[in-house]
């Protein structure tokens, strides 16, 4: 008699995705982040659902409803801080996941990679709209500044911004629609994640060496389920340390002041996970140019497969490309730091240099180093 997990239509899908899935025998801890992202998504949906039960999407009551959640709702404070800091953990895992894909050449699975880029954009949009909901000073001014960037689009820009706002400024209509989108987008993300997995399981996972591993596969369960649970324990430990000891570490103090359209904060900045893109935006004096650079800073990931010149897929045995990759990581950290600094000398110059370096590494130096390494192989 066939095992029910192999014969039942629904159980069969789960079995082929998480139990009997053939996985390379040598994948490292860098392959944990996919499952951690799934856990983060479930955590965000659950905590978000409980927050939505008590939150009111109205400019008059939004700020006080968040205060009410923290003060009066049973364990409301922990739900709120798990949701806010869960977003930070989500982005840490996302950046690690994308970085691993770049380092080990996983972008050669073009369908999986492109769905991943779409997922990244969707998660960023969701996080941005979520940041607006508490209706603090930084929420309001962040929403005003970022949505106003669309006015740089020729001809339709101003109309588009007013259409998104639902009026002539960020107001009740904006908050209501942002809440609606913030609620629905995680479910769209879940569907996209399922498609992401579907495409991945068509090709099978990549591995650190970058070579075909069909001759050396092991079942996903118990080997990688145990490995993923270890990663999950580390994630929960980090999240709970953040939530229970310093829940406001990654937030902005300005967001504890209710939104006031008549008083602009001295320095408007988004959450830390957008600072690298914000620094690139600010490094270009022209508004439209800045917006294009902002979009391209993420969209550039889509052309990485086209710029792969090396004969080897992974960077595991390519020391020059490895150096360049870690330069890129350092550059992104510098951009993140600059994004949180005021617009003054020397931060402007550092931001411009770091932005030029970012695009140069990805568009020019990576392909050149790949070609050089091909030549070195012939020596």
Swiss-Prot record:
List UniProt keywords, sorted A-Z: Electron transport, Heme, Iron, Membrane, Metal-binding, Mitochondrion, Mitochondrion inner membrane, Respiratory chain, Transmembrane, Transmembrane helix, Transport, Ubiquinone
Question: Keyword DNA damage: yes or no?
Answer: no
InterPro entries, per this entry?
Answer: Cyt_b/b6_C, Cyt_b/b6_C_sf, Cyt_b/b6_N, Cytb/b6-like_sf, Cytochrome_b, Cytochrome_b_C_euk/bac, Cytochrome_b_N_euk/bac, Di-haem_cyt_TM
Membrane protein topology class: Multi-pass membrane protein
Q: Where in the cell is it found?
A: Mitochondrion inner membrane
What is the protein's known function? Component of the ubiquinol-cytochrome c reductase complex (complex III or cytochrome b-c1 complex) that is part of the mitochondrial respiratory chain. The b-c1 complex mediates electron transfer from ubiquinol to cytochrome c. Contributes to the generation of a proton gradient across the mitochondrial membrane that is then used for ATP synthesis.
Protein name (record): Cytochrome b
Q: Supply the source organism's classification.
A: Eukaryota, Metazoa, Chordata, Craniata, Vertebrata
